[in-house]
Amino acid sequence: HALEDWAETWAHYLLMHETLETAVEFEVIRPPETDREFHVWLSEWMQLVLVLNALNRSIGNADAYPFVVSTAVQKKLQFIHDLMHDI
């Protein structure tokens, strides 16, 4: 189901992108000085979700982001990230 995988990868990328933008707007993280390379962007994401998950756990809630970003998923997300930055 290639089209389903493509759509799910886009949805996941957009979720990550919008959450990072919201974190910048609320001054939870610093805005990027330049366009972020994928590995920097992903690292910022992973740091943010560690905090989000810890906050949720501290009040007895389930993880906000219970996913593992495998190497295969990273490659798919990087393709979309690069595509977005080439536009």
Where are these regions (language model features)?
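Pan-zinc metallopeptidase signature
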Residues: A2-I87
